[in-house]
């Protein structure tokens, strides 16, 4: 899978750009705040219709312009696709091969993209929000059904919270039941994904760290008390919501559930958030991203497009070398942003394209 060209109009600080990409490595360099990450964000939007920066549609449109337009050309197994995404007051509208897209399923998968950002480097030592967000994004990269389920869960959560905010029990049981059902399916998919990639994380961690430490992933739900753990499926979440109902009515919000769960990154049975060195934490996250790429390649019979957002500055020379060796062997298309080209390990890479980004202007070199 390759992105061969992209056109950007009135997007963030990029007024207009047309960029032709190399099929292997593409390096975008320049000072901070010039538009490098916006190019990666545009590619990601053309694959998922979502921003990896948690931005709302108005945030994506250039100042004093009515809308933004992204167009990309992608190729897989010799078959080309033209993808267009309109971003405006009316929301987001997509076309594939110049035909309007009415179902997300018709848009999803034309560009399979994985993002690796400094935010993810930090998630091993951060609070649960970053790890949960990473997990959700990793799963829906290969499972459209998970994305739809995630939307459904949060729609139900919003409705239930509205009732709780009013302090009303009328109709609460109905929303609680639906939320528990969707939440159970969400948790099952999360735990299933972690079970799939854990052996890959273990393998890549050993290759990076060069030791015998055993890496592991543990989903950490709120179902921690013996009376809840002993229950199965939806009954467990119903019991959890029931146990906290008085508190939730008092606070006006849902305080437990999959939207509050966490994932533990573990080495030799110890959670690295509290017991791991910075080097161990960074090696673990690097192994996790490698596992995500490997998993998607197996799932789709083709590696995804990788978007590396200023990662070279976050990794030491050895881990940078580990990552670049992995990417060379994968034969995948890679987009790299950096403020300092000298930090990249491009030796041995036969072909790559370089671009300088300044004040929203992208210049090929």
UniProtKB/Swiss-Prot annotation:
A Pfam family per the record: SMC_N
Binding annotation for ATP: 30-37
One cellular-component annotation, GO: cytoplasm
Domain of life: Bacteria
UniProt keyword annotations, A-Z: ATP-binding, Cytoplasm, DNA damage, DNA repair, DNA replication, DNA-binding, Nucleotide-binding, SOS response
Gene Ontology terms, MF aspect: ATP binding; single-stranded DNA binding
Keyword Nucleotide-binding carried by entry: yes
Entry keyword DNA damage: yes
BP GO annotations: DNA replication; DNA synthesis involved in DNA repair; double-strand break repair; SOS response
Localization per Swiss-Prot or TrEMBL: Cytoplasm
Alphabetized InterPro entries for the sequence: DNA-binding_RecF, DNA-binding_RecF_CS, P-loop_NTPase, RecF/RecN/SMC_N, RecF_2
Disulfide bond entries: none
Stored Gene3D superfamilies: P-loop containing nucleotide triphosphate hydrolases, RecF/RecN/SMC, N-terminal domain
Family under the similarity heading: Belongs to the RecF family.
Family matches, as HAMAP family: RecF
Function according to Swiss-Prot or TrEMBL: The RecF protein is involved in DNA metabolism; it is required for DNA replication and normal SOS inducibility. RecF binds preferentially to single-stranded, linear DNA. It also seems to bind ATP.
Protein name: DNA replication and repair protein RecF
Protein's organism: Geobacter metallireducens (strain ATCC 53774 / DSM 7210 / GS-15)
Protein's gene: recF
